[in-house]
């Protein structure tokens, strides 16, 4: 059942600020690049200091849960007070159970484990190219397959350059594999992580989920399923 939320009243100063869609888009792109860069650098540094992929993922889940789970609980409070059955996972996720599991597996568990494991084999420079660089490729292919989106000629040329860049970065590591190198393993893991995130993005777009609620669902799934598993396995 869809939840009708009252519009949030923004402060007067914020309402008075007017930005063009281009400005908002450019600012969002810059912030996204900074977040991706920070994620890659911190993950690589954590891997080089002896933390296992499960350890890094555990820290990621705890940090996100501390912020998003109380927010999700507050977000669904009006519906609960109205006697509506909302969300799943004991009120931690704002989405129904099935999409919560789907988003949690693709955008949460698999993505994190594949990406963090890749840092144990390949340098951060490879991750910065292969993970965010492959996202447009995977997303376009999945959107064409499941959403029936058309691929223009200009877009196809751009995707071709992405493939060329991935080959230039990952091809050298494949050649080094004959000499016992293991960088190629990390490269493949980075590409697989990008595929998981692209699958999550296309699924969210296909079902029209709100980005904030989808992120909350990822966190709720990881908190309920991954944290107990980590405690049992690692202690």
Question: Which residues does each predicted region cover?
Answer:
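Hydrophobic transmembrane alpha-helices of multi-pass small-molecule transport proteins
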Residues: 68, 154-173, 219, 223-226
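Hydrophobic alpha-helical transmembrane segments in multi-pass integral membrane proteins
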Residues: 111-116, 167-179, 223-235
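Hydrophobic residues within membrane-embedded alpha-helical segments of Major Facilitator Superfamily
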Residues: 28, 34-35, 63, 106-110, ...
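Specific transmembrane alpha-helical segments of multi-pass solute transporters/efflux pumps
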Residues: 35-40, 73-80, 86-131, 140, ...
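Specific alpha-helical transmembrane segments that line the substrate/conduction pathway
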Residues: 55-66, 115-150, 193
């Amino acid at each position: 059942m869809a939840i009708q939320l009252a519009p949030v009243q923004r402060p007067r100063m914020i309402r008075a600020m007017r930005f063009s869609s281009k400005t908002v888009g450019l600012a969002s792109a810059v912030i996204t690049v900074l977040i991706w860069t920070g994620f890659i650098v911190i993950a690589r540094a954590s891997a080089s200091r002896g933390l296992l992929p499960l350890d890094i993922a555990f820290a990621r889940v705890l940090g996100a849960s501390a912020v998003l789970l109380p927010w999700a609980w507050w977000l669904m409070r009006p519906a609960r007070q109205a006697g509506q059955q909302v969300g799943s996972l004991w009120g931690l996720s704002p989405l129904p159970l099935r999409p919560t599991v789907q988003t949690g597996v693709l955008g949460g568990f698999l993505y994190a484990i594949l990406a963090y494991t890749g840092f144990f084999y390949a340098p951060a420079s490879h991750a910065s190219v292969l993970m965010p660089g492959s996202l447009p490729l995977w997303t376009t292919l999945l959107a064409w397959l499941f959403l029936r989106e058309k691929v223009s000629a200009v877009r196809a040329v751009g995707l071709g350059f992405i493939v060329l860049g991935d080959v230039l970065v990952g091809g050298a590591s494949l050649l080094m594999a004959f000499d016992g190198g293991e960088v190629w393993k990390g490269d493949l893991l980075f590409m697989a992580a990008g595929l998981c995130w692209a699958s999550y993005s296309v699924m969210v777009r296909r079902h029209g989920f709100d980005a904030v609620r989808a992120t909350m669902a990822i966190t709720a799934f990881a908190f309920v399923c991954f944290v107990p598993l980590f405690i049992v396995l690692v202690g």
